[in-house]
Swiss-Prot record:
Pfam family, one: RNase_T
A GO molecular-function descriptor: endonuclease activity
Subcellular location: Nucleus, Nucleolus
Residues in Exonuclease domain copies: 230-381
Subunit structure as annotated in this protein's UniProt entry: Can bind ESR1 and ESR2. This interaction is abrogated by estrogen and augmented by tamoxifen treatment.
Modification type Phosphoserine: residues: 123
Name of the gene encoding the protein in the UniProt record: Rexo4
First-listed, main subcellular location of the protein, grouped into a coarse class: nucleus
Native species: Mus musculus (Mouse)
GO biological process: DNA catabolic process; DNA repair; rRNA processing
Keywords recorded for this protein, A-Z: Exonuclease, Hydrolase, Isopeptide bond, Nuclease, Nucleus, Phosphoprotein, Ubl conjugation
Bias-annotated ranges (Basic and acidic residues): 121-137
Source superkingdom: Eukaryota
Protein role: May function as an exonuclease.
Protein name, as recorded: RNA exonuclease 4
Amino acid sequence: MCACAVAGVAVSSLVVPTAESGEMKTKATAPVPQPGPIRKLARKKAKKKFRKSKALAGSGVPGSHPAAVAGRPPKAPENFSQNWKALQELLKQKSQAAEKPLVSQMDDKMHPQIIQQNRKKASDKSKGDKQRTEKAKSTRGSVTSAPTDRKILVPPTDTSGTEQKKGAKKRTYSDISSHQGALKPKWKATEAAVILNQPTPTEEDIWFDDVDPDDIEDAIGPEAAMLVRKRLGQKKRTISLEKEQAFGGLTKALALDCEMVGVGPKGEESIAARVSIVNQYGKCVYDKYVKPTEPVTDYRTAVSGIRPENLKQGEEFEVVKKEVAEMLKGRILVGHALHNDLKVLFLDHPKKKIRDTQKFKPFRSRVKSGRPSLKRLSEKILGIRVQQAEHCSIQDAQAAMRLYVMVKREWESSTANRRAPAATPQHRIKNS
């Protein structure tokens, strides 16, 4: 065993005796792997040798080596498949068809028969087009467009190729639009007629159990409410807040109500903007707007009904306060949530002479509310609707007075019993 280096590559050799001469010969074995770049060079040389041997094998005579024949495309016609032959024939036919020149590009003398046939076809086409246009002209005047046709007809211009008949009237855009308006569908008109011609509800159509006629009037209408009242034997309650022929001066009891506006950064604080007082019969005895003592930040028009122009012509606050205090002195004061009204007027009134409809227990139990609104009390007890949109201080005072008058005897008797002092035992002995 000996080792030699060739071109920087270590190769191991083996001494083998030959059979013929008996001499010892060296036989090269696989190269020993060497570290570093020497190993890379050996790999590159081995690859080059493999590529050269493959190229030499491929460049040989066709058919000499089976691997070379399989790798190259066939050149002899007998080696092609049937599909390939069919594809070649198809491509030849297409190329021949493309090489033929068009008839229109050739001279007329070369193909006279083909040109005559084409001319006949063109003449037949033009005749058919003329016949169609004549039919359209004849039917245009006689046949009217259907109501569902919404296309706007444009009058023919000079550039359009078709000539108008002499004496024919030109159709303008206004004529077309008016004609279309006349042909509009009539479903809207019929629907409106059906709605207007609806019959009034009869007794057979309406049937309610334990429903207030006033609620029926809100939901369906006055006719239905009238039929329900007739069936129940009721009459529509017509309670007036004001007696027409009554005394218009100051009475023993007066009702007060104030409308307020908002002041302050957010308009949360309230000041008086309108003060109204009515007497026992609902007659207005005092009604004045009040000039604001502070800048108004929220007029609350949707609720109060107060507008800036109302306050410009108002009275001074101190004047209103003095006049109201003189009117209420020694009288019964009626109202709803009176503590709010007295607060904005900076007034006080004896508690025994205040009749607040919000605090009257029979009213609260009747409407099942601890703090009922004036709107709810008026609707449930009086059958009158107030405060539907903007509030009116006169109407609110009239409603509060009307509620008080209805239960005046009961209310006054209950307050008298509450004020009467309890009898002491000594007083009972003297009486006995």
